[in-house]
Design a protein with these regions (language model features):
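Active-site loop immediately N-terminal to the catalytic Tyr-X3-Lys motif
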Residues: 538, 585-591, 613, 664, ...
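Alpha-helical segment proximal to the catalytic Tyr-Lys
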Residues: 565, 609-610, 685
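Short, small/polar-rich loop/turn modules that mediate ligand/substrate recognition or access, typified
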Residues: 526, 612, 617, 687-689
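Active-site helix of classical SDR
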Residues: 560, 596, 604
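Residue(s) in the substrate-gating loop at a strand-loop-helix junction
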Residues: 580
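Substrate-binding pocket helix/loop in short-chain dehydrogenase/reductase
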Residues: 536-537, 541-549, 657
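Short C-terminal tail/terminal secondary-structure segment
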Residues: 688-704
C-alpha cells in the first residue's frame, strides 16, 4: 500500500548536478581543427548534465580548400542530422560552404517556406559530404562566431520553460545572456538569433525559450568552457532556490520499499503491455530513481504531468504528456483498460484538433510514459533502447519541471506548436527513413540453460533478429560469460541475465518476474536447461533417476507454468522445448535420460492442447549429438556414451555420430538455433504440437 503524507513534511528538493570542465590540454594537443571540434562535441555529449542523448549540435567555421578552384573557402562544420554528440565520429559532421549558406537568406520568404529551405541545404554541401545537414544548421551559420554550441541542459531548459525564467536569467548572467521567445528551429530562428546578438553586444549565449541554449567562443576550448560555465551557474542558482522548499508542492505519497516497487513493476508491466494494442509489439523499461519518485509523490504531480513536456527533444521521445495511474487501483483490470483507452481517445482528440489536410496519418496513440505514485516510471517503445531513452528523456522533463517551478509557473508548449513539431513533415521523413524492424523486434524471450552451447546459440540467434533475451542458467560464472559475450555483440539493452536452477521453484519464479520487470512481459520461452546421464538400469540410482526428471521434466514444467499466464494475458506466445533424439528413439544405458526426454516431449504436446485457446504455441526441437560447445558433452556423458558404443571418446566419437546420421553431417548449436527461430517466428504462426528433428537424419527418430 502507498502511504499518503502531509505535503508540508520534508526538506528541500533534490538538487541539480552542475557540470565541471573535463577539457584536457594534453588530450587536445596536436589535434587538427576538425578533430578539436569532435573532441569538444564528444565531451559535451557524454555529459548528461549538458545535453540529452542525440540532442544538441556543435559547429566550427573552418577554412577549406575548394576542390574545383583550389581557392580557400570558409566552411561550416556542423553536427549532421541524427546521431549523438557523445559518440559521433568525424563523418557525423555536415560540411557546407558558408557563403552559400548565408546567401540562402535571399531565397527565404518567411516561415511558410521553412520546409522548402531544408531542400536547399544539400546544394551548399562542401566536398560531396553525404552527411545530411540538420534543421538547426541556420542557427550556427548566421551567428558570427567561429565556434558555436547548441545544447539542451536541464538547468537552462528549466529557465526556458518557466514564467520566471527570463528574470532568473538576468539575475544569473546580467547582460551576458540573451533571451528569445519560442520559435521552431529553422531559418526564421537563425535570422532572429543573428539580429538579437547584433543588437546586444557582449552576450555569451542566448536562452531559446522552451528549447535550450546556444553559446559560443573564439576557439574550441573557450567555447566548451563557456558552455559548461553557463550551465553550472544556472544549476547553482536553481539549487539555492530548491533548497528553500520541497519540490512539487511537497511529498504526499511516499515511495514503497525497493523490493515492493520491483514486485509491483513485475506485476503491472505485462498487464499494461497486453493492453497497448497496435501494429507493433512493445518492450518496457522501469525506473524508480529518486527524482522520479520525488515527482510522482508530489502534491502537484498530476497537474504538472498533464501540462506536458516543453522541450521538443523530450516530447518527440515521450509524447507530449504521460499517463498517470492511481496506485491503489493497479490490480483492477477494468481500471487499467479504461485508463489506456482514455489515453488513446485523448491522443486521437489532440490529433483531430490540430491535424491539417497534408499532415501525416495519426501514429500509435498508446502512452509512451506511465507514471505511478510510490512506484516509479514505466516507458514502452518498439525496442528496449528506445524505451530506455524515452524514460531518460522524461527524467530530463522532470528535472525541468522541478527547476521551472522553483522560479515560477512551469510552461508547456501550446497544443498546436507541439503537434507541429511531432507531425512536422521533416520529422515524418526521418521516421520513414528508419530501417524496417527485424522479424522479432518488440518480442521478449527467456532461454533456460543459456550458458551452454545450444542455449547461447539460440539466444544469439533471437537477438540477431531483434528480440530481447533473458538468459538463465544455474552456473553463475558461465552465465556471466554468456551475458558478457552477447552484450559485446548486441549491446547491453536487449540482454539480461538471471541466475536460475530450473529445479528451484522460487528461482524460476524470480527469473520470470525479472523478465517482466526488465522487458515488460514475455513472448518466447525456450526451455533448454539440461543434463545427461548414462548408466545401465541396474546401476541407475534413484538419485540419478530423480535428477534427470527434476531437470528435464519438472524444470520444463515450472518454466512453462510461469510463461503461460504472461503469454495468455496478451493472447500470444511461443514455447519451444529442446528435446533429444532419445525422446523418440530408445538408446542403451540411458533409461533415465531418454525416458525423461520422452516425458518432456509429451508434456509439450499436452501444453500445445492447453495453450491453443490462449494463442500459445508449443513445439519441440529434437537435436542429436550436438557436441561442440556443449557442457554436457564435456563431462562424463561423453566418456559414458563412448563406452556404450565401445569407441574412443575423442575424435572417434564425433566421427561415429557424424557417420551414423543419414546425411553424414555434424550437428552444430547454430543448426538447432535456426529451428528454434523458425518455430518462434511468424513463419510458424500456424504450427503447434509439432516436432522438428535436427539430427542430420536418424531413421529411429522419424516421427510416426
Amino acid at each position: 500500500m502507498t502511504t499518503v503524507l502531509d505535503a508540508s513534511a520534508g526538506q528541500g528538493a533534490l538538487p541539480f548536478v552542475a557540470p565541471a570542465s573535463r577539457w584536457s590540454d594534453e588530450a587536445a594537443r596536436g589535434l587538427s581543427a576538425p578533430d578539436l571540434l569532435l573532441y569538444r562535441s564528444n565531451l559535451l555529449g557524454s555529459d548528461l548534465t549538458v545535453t540529452n542523448f542525440g540532442g544538441g549540435n556543435t559547429s566550427a567555421k573552418l577554412a577549406g580548400r575548394d576542390p574545383l578552384t583550389g581557392q580557400e573557402a570558409p566552411v561550416l562544420w556542423v553536427k549532421g542530422s541524427g546521431g549523438d554528440l557523445g559518440s559521433m565520429k568525424l563523418d557525423g559532421f555536415s560540411t557546407l560552404y558558408l557563403d552559400k549558406l548565408l546567401g540562402l537568406e535571399g531565397l527565404y520568404g518567411g516561415v511558410a517556406q521553412e520546409d522548402a529551405m531544408v531542400g536547399y541545404l544539400p546544394h551548399c554541401t562542401f566536398g560531396l559530404n553525404p552527411s545530411a545537414a540538420s534543421i538547426d544548421t541556420p542557427l550556427h551559420a548566421y551567428l558570427p562566431f567561429a565556434h558555436v554550441d547548441h545544447v539542451h541542459p536541464d538547468a537552462l531548459i528549466a529557465l526556458a520553460a518557466s514564467s520566471g525564467g527570463e528574470a532568473a536569467a538576468r539575475a544569473i548572467y546580467g547582460d551576458q545572456m540573451g533571451w528569445l521567445p519560442w520559435k521552431r528551429p529553422g531559418f526564421d530562428l537563425g535570422l532572429r538569433l543573428r539580429d538579437h546578438v547584433a543588437a546586444h553586444p557582449g552576450l555569451r549565449g542566448v536562452v531559446l525559450a522552451g528549447h535550450g541554449v546556444i553559446c559560443w567562443g573564439d576557439d574550441a576550448k573557450a567555447c566548451y568552457e563557456n558552455t559548461i560555465d553557463l550551465i553550472a551557474r544556472a544549476a547553482a542558482y536553481l539549487n539555492a532556490r530548491l533548497a528553500q522548499a520541497p519540490a512539487f508542492g511537497g511529498e504526499t505519497v511516499a515511495p514503497l520499499a525497493p523490493t515492493d516497487r520491483a514486485q509491483a513493476a513485475a506485476a503491472l508491466m505485462p498487464r499494461l503491455r497486453a493492453l497497448m494494442i497496435g501494429d507493433r509489439r512493445k518492450v518496457g523499461h522501469f525506473s524508480d530513481d529518486a527524482k522520479t519518485l520525488e515527482f510522482v509523490g508530489g502534491r502537484d504531480f498530476a497537474r504538472l504531468a498533464a501540462i506536458g513536456t516543453s522541450c521538443p527533444d523530450h516530447f518527440l521521445r515521450t509524447k507530449i504528456a504521460p499517463m498517470a495511474l492511481d496506485p491503489g487501483r493497479l490490480n483492477d483490470d477494468a481500471y487499467l483498460t479504461e485508463a489506456i483507452a482514455g489515453y488513446r481517445e485523448g491522443y486521437a482528440a489532440y490529433y483531430e484538433r490540430n491535424a491539417g489536410p497534408g499532415d501525416p496519418a495519426m501514429r500509435d496513440a498508446n502512452p509512451v510514459v506511465v507514471l505511478v505514485p510510490g512506484i516509479g516510471r514505466f516507458t514502452f517503445a518498439a525496442d528496449k533502447t528506445t524505451a530506455r531513452l524515452a524514460g531518460e528523456f522524461y527524467a530530463n522533463a522532470i528535472n525541468v519541471m522541478r527547476g521551472a517551478t522553483a522560479l515560477g509557473d512551469y510552461l508547456g508548449l501550446a497544443d498546436s506548436e507541439a503537434f507541429a513539431i511531432e507531425y512536422w513533415a521533416l520529422e515524418e521523413a526521418k521516421l520513414q527513413r528508419m530501417p524496417r524492424p527485424k522479424p522479432l523486434a518488440g518480442r521478449v524471450a527467456l532461454v533456460t540453460g543459456a550458458a551452454g552451447g545450444i542455449g547461447a546459440a539460440v539466444a544469439a540467434r533471437l537477438l540477431s533478429e531483434g528480440a530481447c533475451v533473458m538468459l538463465t542458467d544455474r552456473d553463475a560464472e558461465t552465465l556471466e560469460d554468456a551475458r558478457r559475450n552477447l552484450t559485446g555483440l548486441f549491446g547491453a539493452d536487449p540482454v539480461r541475465a538471471s541466475l536460475c536452477d530450473v529445479t528451484d521453484e522460487a528461482q524460476v519464479k524470480a527469473a520470470f518476474a525479472a523478465t517482466a520487470r526488465e522487458f515488460g512481459g514475455l513472448d518466447i520461452l525456450v526451455a533448454n536447461a539440461g543434463l545427461a546421464s548414462s548408466a545401465p538400469i541396474e546401476e541407475t540410482t534413484l538419485e540419478l533417476w530423480r535428477k534427470n526428471y527434476d531437470v528435464l521434466v519438472e524444470g520444463y514444467f515450472l518454466a512453462s507454468r510461469e510463461a503461460f499466464p504472461l503469454m495468455g494475458r496478451q493472447g500470444d506466445g511461443a514455447i519451444v522445448f529442446i528435446g533429444s533424439k532419445n525422446a523418440l528413439a530408445a538408446t542403451p544405458n540411458a533409461s533415465a535420460y531418454a525416458s525423461a526426454k520422452a516425458a518432456s516431449l509429451h508434456l509439450a504436446r499436452c501444453l500445445a492442447l492447453e495453450g491453443a485457446a490462449k494463442g500459445i504455441r508449443v513445439n519441440v526441437v529434437n537435436p542429436d549429438a550436438v557436441i561442440r560447445g556443449s557442457k554436457i558433452w564435456d563431462g562424463d556423458w561423453r566418456r559414458d556414451r563412448a563406452g556404450a558404443y565401445g569407441i574412443d571418446p575423442g575424435e572417434e566419437l564425433e566421427a561415429f555420430y557424424r557417420n551414423r546420421s543419414l546425411l553424414r553431417r555434424d550437428v552444430l548449436p547454430e543448426d538447432v538455433a535456426e529451428a528454434v527461430l523458425f518455430l518462434v517466428s511468424d513463419a510458424a504462426s500456424k504450427s503447434t504440437g509439432n516436432v522438428i528433428n535436427v539430427d542430420a537424419g536418424n531413421a529411429q527418430a522419424f516421427t510416426r
